[in-house]
């Protein structure tokens, strides 16, 4: 309660200090000492920057306050209620794990955490987006190892699944036999007794012990290479084993006390074991089929598989590749993709804790949640990161978990696509179908921007659906271990928010037209979520680069920011980090300033040109990823310019600006040393210079070859004369299938031919 009260005070103080600054500094200077045009423009610009930064700080405090309310009010659903709800549950769930050039060991942990989820009809599908025919032996070996993972998991679980399935079936047979109506007659007084016997309870306890031992044995055999492996062993495997042993303790206690659960509860306990170890795992490669979209992004990888669900497909070979044709009779299908009520999109470097599926689906099926389309627990970071940059990036991830929980309190939830449980009926409402090359391409999750989950959140809201975050930490995901991979991730995150803003405004207008109530706080939080990176980056750039008049500085600005930093430090300690990490995060944001600016500028470029920005996946490899040289050089320039500003302000006795410049210089240099590395930064700069100097080789065709190519129709062989072939190599056979399938594809090439001559229309008739 005290934390909630202090949170309210922090919001109030931030607003009061901002108003105080506007009145005592800006308005006062305008009235008492007008400074001309330049000072007026500086004052307006500085006020705009301070206002936007203060607004973002206030939104942080507001979202944090909502999270505190949710954590206070949350009550975990008892295990028995979940078991009762899912006893005869029929709605299946498909876990989709998109993967591209991932380390097989990383993907393996993700698949295991999904496969061990307790669910009645669980399917885990690995969506491999690697090239079907890798060029190198290393890539081929990695692809083969990745594709083999689903089969390995099914094989490993087949033994315990068969045992617990047979145990459950045997229990049901014995219970039905004991409840035979013939035995329930008045002549049989024992018929009124419970059909459950101590032998049933003892066998169930033995099964729980066997399940726990199986998981513990697997944990002992698992290699522990890094902190992610340690988390997988301790939290996924041993965590589940520990919970099963807790149930075993209860069963042993019931035996000792000569107590017997009823038949329904016994069946639920049997079903739990069976469902934990039962899974249908498979893999799918969309690039094997020419009729599916090959857009290089995660959203279309998911869309390609979702579009196949619930139908049978016949594979048809053509010159353009393998095509999938829909067939109505599943018996005639070469590929049948079962449909399920729910989907779970899971990044290839994420891990789920036990109960993730059952608790979130239970939440979706609670009364009043019929229009909730997506629910998830925003992922947290793995503990014990070996590098400073991974630890600080993880700290910011943990803060985002809190903020997303708070945004749900105000109805401003955004979908974070790493581990979302989705009601399939909801995304069928927002599907867009277009015809590309004669084939229908269904887009459920928008790929217009590289933050596809954010845009889909707006689309769902426009169709009357809502989103909600589940207030527990049940999912974890890896953070980039080096600066190069972090650049890729954060540049993508900074790109796209501005492009989606018009959709948000349109949704707000439509909701007002339908006379729906829209909270101002919801719109504030949504706007801040999508646009704060833009204004915060440009605002920080102005504060660093422009020498504002010292009369605009005031201690009140520092006081307005103080509640934000204190609250952030408190949240960091709550998440298991240090209070002093607020300074490390500030330096972290300084070195990421050029990355964020690049992402924002990319958004502006896309808005002006209409071109789709390529989706760049975050590298998930064990080797260090080199960062582009520009993102390494600019942090050094920030340090140099801050030192120059410090020197000028000291000479001018502008002590406020001097202190700010010194603060920036120290933290920026610390961030370079801690997060990039002095040696690594010079290596990346050198590699950037080499990449700029060298260009890839291109095959140079001779003019003779161009002329020959221009004169020979597509699919035809070169002409020969009596002396022999036209070239040293043997003529290629005519690709008759390609000609019949594609037709004449030379029209555009003919229009661009260099040796064309324009002639009068009647010249050819003369």
For the regions a protein language model found, what residue spans apply to each?
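Hydrophobic transmembrane helical bundles of polytopic secretory-pathway membrane proteins
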Residues: 1-81, 97-100, 105
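Loop-to-transmembrane boundary segments
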Residues: 1-14, 96-98, 103, 511-534, ...
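Membrane-embedded multi-pass helical conduit in multi-pass membrane proteins
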Residues: 22-52, 526-610, 626-703
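Internal catalytic domains of large membrane-associated glycosyltransferases
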Residues: 55-507
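Acidic, Ser/Thr-rich low-complexity segments on the non-lumenal side of membrane proteins
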Residues: 85-129, 602-610, 703-715, 721-724, ...
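Cytosol-/stroma-facing membrane-proximal "stalk/adaptor" domains immediately downstream
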Residues: 139, 150-151, 156-218, 668-766
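Nucleotide-sugar-dependent glycosyltransferase catalytic core
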Residues: 480-495, 582, 611-622
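C-terminal, non-catalytic tails of nucleotide-sugar-dependent glycosyltransferases
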Residues: 496-517, 599, 675-676
């Amino acid at each position: 309660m005290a934390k909630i009260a202090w949170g309210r005070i922090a919001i109030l103080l931030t607003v009061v200090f901002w108003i105080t600054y506007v009145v005592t500094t800006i308005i006062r200077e305008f009235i008492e000492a007008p400074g001309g045009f330049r000072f007026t423009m500086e004052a307006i610009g500085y006020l705009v920057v301070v206002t936007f930064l203060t607004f973002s700080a206030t939104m942080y405090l507001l979202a944090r306050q909502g999270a505190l309310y949710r954590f206070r009010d949350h009550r975990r659903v008892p295990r028995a209620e979940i078991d009762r709800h899912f006893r005869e549950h029929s709605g299946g769930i498909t876990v989709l794990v998109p993967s591209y050039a991932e380390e097989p060991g990383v993907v393996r942990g993700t698949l295991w955490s999904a496969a061990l989820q307790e669910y009645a009809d669980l399917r885990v599908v690995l969506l491999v987006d690697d090239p079907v025919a890798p060029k190198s032996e290393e890539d081929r070996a990695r692809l083969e190892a990745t594709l083999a993972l689903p089969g390995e998991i099914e094989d490993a679980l087949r033994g315990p699944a068969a045992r617990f399935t047979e145990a459950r079936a045997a229990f049901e047979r014995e219970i039905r036999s004991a409840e035979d109506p013939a035995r329930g007659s008045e002549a049989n007084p024992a018929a009124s007794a419970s059909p459950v016997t101590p032998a049933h309870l003892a066998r169930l306890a033995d099964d729980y012990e066997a399940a726990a031992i199986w998981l513990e044995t697997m944990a002992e055999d698992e290699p522990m290479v890094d902190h992610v492996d340690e988390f997988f062993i301790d939290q996924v495997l041993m965590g589940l084993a520990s919970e099963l042993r807790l149930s075993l303790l209860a069963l042993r206690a019931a035996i000792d006390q000569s107590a017997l659960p009823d038949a329904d509860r016994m069946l639920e306990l049997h079903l739990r074991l069976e469902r934990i170890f039962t899974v249908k795992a498979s893999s799918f490669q969309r690039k094997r089929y020419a009729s599916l979209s090959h857009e290089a992004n995660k959203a279309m990888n998911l869309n390609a598989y979702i579009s196949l669900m619930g139908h049978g497909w016949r594979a048809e070979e053509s010159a353009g590749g393998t095509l999938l044709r829909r067939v109505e009779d599943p018996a005639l299908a070469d590929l049948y993709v079962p449909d399920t009520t729910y989907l779970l999109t899971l990044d290839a470097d994420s891990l789920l804790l036990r109960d993730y599926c059952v608790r979130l689906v239970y939440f979706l099926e609670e009364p009043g949640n019929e229009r909730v389309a997506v629910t998830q627990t925003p992922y947290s970071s793995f503990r014990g990161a070996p590098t400073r940059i991974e630890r600080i990036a993880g700290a910011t991830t943990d803060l985002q978990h809190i903020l997303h929980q708070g945004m749900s309190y105000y109805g401003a939830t955004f979908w974070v696509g790493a581990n979302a449980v989705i009601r399939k009926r909801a995304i069928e409402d927002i599907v867009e179908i277009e015809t590309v090359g004669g084939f229908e391409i269904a887009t459920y999750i928008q790929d217009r921007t590289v933050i596809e989950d954010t845009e889909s959140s707006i689309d769902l809201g426009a169709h009357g659906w809502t989103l909600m975050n589940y207030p527990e930490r049940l999912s974890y995901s890896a953070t980039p271990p080096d600066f190069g991979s972090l650049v890729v991730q954060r540049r993508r995150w900074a790109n796209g928010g501005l492009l989606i803003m018009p959709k948000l405004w349109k949704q707000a207008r439509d909701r007002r037209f339908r006379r729906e109530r829209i909270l101002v706080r919801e719109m504030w939080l949504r706007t801040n979520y999508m646009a704060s990176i833009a204004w915060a980056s440009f605002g920080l750039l102005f504060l660093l680069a422009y020498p504002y008049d010292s009369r605009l500085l005031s201690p009140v600005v520092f006081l307005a920011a103080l509640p934000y930093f204190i609250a952030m430090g408190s949240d960091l300690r709550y998440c298991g980090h240090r209070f002093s990490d607020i300074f490390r995060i500030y330096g972290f944001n300084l070195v990421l300033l050029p990355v964020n600016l690049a992402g924002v500028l990319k958004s502006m470029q896309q808005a002006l040109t209409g071109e789709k920005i390529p989706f760049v996946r975050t590298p998930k490899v064990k080797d260090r990823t080199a960062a582009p040289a520009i993102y390494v050089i600019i942090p050094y320039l920030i340090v140099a310019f801050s030192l120059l500003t410090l020197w000028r302000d000291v000479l001018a006795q502008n002590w406020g600006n001097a202190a700010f410049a010194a603060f920036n210089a120290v933290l920026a240099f610390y961030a370079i040393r801690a997060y990039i590395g002095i040696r690594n930064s010079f290596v990346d700069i050198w590699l950037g210079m080499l990449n700029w100097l060298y260009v890839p080789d291109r095959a140079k065709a001779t003019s003779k070859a161009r002329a020959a190519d221009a004169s020979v129709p597509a699919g035809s062989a070169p002409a020969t004369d009596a002396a022999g072939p036209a070239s040293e190599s043997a003529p290629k056979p005519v690709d008759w299938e390609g000609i019949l399938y594609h037709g004449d594809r030379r029209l555009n090439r003919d229009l661009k031919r260099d040796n064309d001559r324009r002639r009068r229309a009647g010249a050819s008739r003369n």
